[in-house]
Amino acid sequence: MKMVAAAKLKRAQDSAEKGRPYSEKMNNIILNLSSGISDKETAPKLLSGTGKEQVHLCVVLTSDRGLCGGFNANIIKKAKSYFAKLNKEGKELKIITVGSKGNDQLKRVYGNKIIENISFKNSKNANYFYAEKV
């Protein structure tokens, strides 16, 4: 069982590494767009913000199965800590969960704040069709 989990983890790490250049390029594009804005009044709200920051949308990514050791537990622990901080500050919280493990844990306490759950339990291979849902 550990060998299977290790092989799947290695495959997932390789996929994540292949996506890193794309992520870095997207980060550069957003930084260039936001730095080129001189007038905050005419800029799109996505880039300039509204200044209110009252509503926070948090996307919690966990697995659908439990073969990840402490991965899911650590993600959920960090998420709950962050949610508690937002609640303490009086912020409104909306949650999207990706993966059934996170949804199962968070719906007990934050069920009314979860606006969507995306799960890939029935898919063997992730592809664009499934990623498009996210």
Predicted regions and their residues:
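Conserved loop-to-helix interface motifs that mediate assembly, gating, or partner/ligand docking
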Residues: 1-134
